[in-house]
Amino acid sequence: MDDKQWERFLVPYRQAVEELKVKLKGIRTLYEYEDDHSPIEFVTGRVKPVASILEKARRKSIPLHEIETMQDIAGLRIMCQFVDDIQIVKEMLFARKDFTVVDQRDYIAEHKESGYRSYHLVVLYPLQTVSGEKHVLVEIQIRTLAMNFWATIEHSLNYKYSGNIPEKVKLRLQRASEAASRLDEEMSEIRGEVQEAQAAFSRKKKGSEQQ
């Protein structure tokens, strides 16, 4: 495909990311209206660059005419404050009627050897386009802020070392992953106190805005 064909091919994926970001951010807004803790802290999204798509297709032996079977061309990340929030968000997504969950991978219960932790869902999302309805695959990653910090660092190191991270650095990453996991556990233990403090701050902020 030339540049124009790739641009046309990626249009529905960009549309899917933007629509889902609006919908998922809307969930957080509804919790805020109710002065309740939102299991969603924030949402980000992206469409894979063409170079990354081609690299993965080569690595996974995916022919170009089957490129739509790639599950993460469109991707969203949902960040949560607490590990328990991940289960709540997961149940919300499974209950939705505007897309269908077609795959899931739990890297929290069984983290990768590198130390990577996250919960992945793949959904089939229907789009309304000028040519009619089109379904695209979107990967949704759900993780805590600590998990996301670790994953961002690992991604940067993978890029720096072209996927061949030195063993000494790998060991430090694994230790950092264990530390991040302990942090999540500790935060879960004081969840009630954290939420009370956040609620008090939110009430104070609203009060000052109304004055």
Swiss-Prot record:
Disruption phenotype: No visible phenotype, double yjbM-ywaC and triple relA-yjbM-ywaC mutants are also viable.
Catalysed reaction equations from the record: GTP + ATP = guanosine 3'-diphosphate 5'-triphosphate + AMP; GDP + ATP = guanosine 3',5'-bis(diphosphate) + AMP
Activity control summary: Allosterically regulated by its own products; pppGpp simulates synthesis 10-fold more than ppGpp. 2 pppGpp molecules bind in a regulatory cleft in the middle of the tetramer in an asymmetric manner. There is a specific contact of Lys-25 to the gamma-phosphate of pppGpp, explaining why pppGpp stimulates activity but ppGpp does not.
Domain of life of the native organism: Bacteria
Keywords: Allosteric enzyme, ATP-binding, GTP-binding, Kinase, Magnesium, Metal-binding, Nucleotide-binding, Transferase
GO process annotations (BP): guanosine tetraphosphate biosynthetic process
Residues at the active site: E139 (proton acceptor)
Binding site for Mg(2+): D72
Induction: Expressed during exponential growth through the transition to the stationary phase, but not during entry of cells into stationary phase. Protein continuously expressed with a peak at 2 hours after inoculation, decreasing until 3.5 hours as cells enter stationary phase (at protein level).
Binding site for guanosine 3'-diphosphate 5'-triphosphate 2: K21, V22, K23, L24, K25, G26, I27, R28, E41, F42, N148
Pathway: Purine metabolism; ppGpp biosynthesis; ppGpp from GTP: step 1/2
Record-linked SUPFAM superfamilies: Nucleotidyltransferase
SMART domains: RelA_SpoT
Positions annotated to bind ATP: R46, V47, K48, S52, K56, A57, R58, R59, D72, R77
Additional observations: The synthase activity of YjbM is greater than that of YwaC.
Function as written in the Swiss-Prot or TrEMBL entry: Functions as a (p)ppGpp synthase; GDP can be used instead of GTP, resulting in an increase of (p)ppGpp synthesis. The enzyme binds ATP, then GDP or GTP and catalysis is highly cooperative. In eubacteria ppGpp (guanosine 3'-diphosphate 5'-diphosphate) is a mediator of the stringent response that coordinates a variety of cellular activities in response to changes in nutritional abundance. Probably has a minor role in the stringent response.
Name of the featured protein: GTP pyrophosphokinase YjbM
Source organism: Bacillus subtilis (strain 168)
